[in-house]
């Protein structure tokens, strides 16, 4: 079985939740629950409410995602 491609969308952090999770409002208006990717966690990149981020979303569950980039 081939792995489905993930969807990459930009969004804005609404609130920080426990366990390095965030509520993100995407540019299409949806809100998703997103966690921080390993590279961002490894390099201690701080993510705060109001930051613009890039989120990868699985096509299987459109309510959860992974934050892969924080825009400067």
From Swiss-Prot:
Q: Which HAMAP family match?
A: IF_1 (MF_00075)
Establish whether keyword RNA-binding is in the entry. Answer: yes
- Pfam families, per database record: eIF-1a
**In terms of domain of life, where is this protein from?**
Bacteria
Q: Which PANTHER family does this one have?
A: TRANSLATION INITIATION FACTOR IF-1, CHLOROPLASTIC (PTHR33370:SF1)
> Which Gene Ontology CC terms are recorded?
cytosol
Which stretches make up the S1-like domain?
Answer: 1-72
Q: Where in the cell is it found?
A: Cytoplasm
The record lists the organism as: Chlorobaculum tepidum (strain ATCC 49652 / DSM 12025 / NBRC 103806 / TLS) (Chlorobium tepidum)
Q: MF terms per GO, please?
A: ribosome binding; rRNA binding; translation initiation factor activity
Q: What this chain does, per the record?
A: One of the essential components for the initiation of protein synthesis. Stabilizes the binding of IF-2 and IF-3 on the 30S subunit to which N-formylmethionyl-tRNA(fMet) subsequently binds. Helps modulate mRNA selection, yielding the 30S pre-initiation complex (PIC). Upon addition of the 50S ribosomal subunit IF-1, IF-2 and IF-3 are released leaving the mature 70S translation initiation complex.
Cross-referenced CDD domains: S1_IF1
Describe its partners and assembly state. Answer: Component of the 30S ribosomal translation pre-initiation complex which assembles on the 30S ribosome in the order IF-2 and IF-3, IF-1 and N-formylmethionyl-tRNA(fMet); mRNA recruitment can occur at any time during PIC assembly.
- What keywords were assigned to this record? Cytoplasm, Initiation factor, Protein biosynthesis, RNA-binding, rRNA-binding
Q: What is the lineage of its organism?
A: Bacteria, Pseudomonadati, Chlorobiota, Chlorobiia, Chlorobiales
Using the UniProt record, give the first listed, main subcellular location: cytoplasm
Look up keyword Protein biosynthesis and say if it applies.
yes
Q: Which gene encodes it?
A: infA
Q: Which NCBIfam families does UniProt cross-reference here?
A: infA (TIGR00008)
Task: Tell me what this protein is called.
Answer: Translation initiation factor IF-1
Q: Which family does it belong to?
A: Belongs to the IF-1 family.
């Amino acid at each position: 079985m081939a792995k489905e491609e993930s969807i990459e969308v930009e969004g804005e952090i609404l609130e920080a939740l426990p366990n390095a999770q965030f509520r993100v409002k995407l540019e299409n208006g949806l809100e998703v629950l997103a966690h921080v990717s390993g590279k961002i966690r490894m390099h201690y990149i701080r993510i705060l409410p109001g930051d613009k981020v890039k989120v990868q979303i699985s096509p299987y569950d459109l309510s959860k995602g992974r934050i892969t980039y924080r825009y400067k």
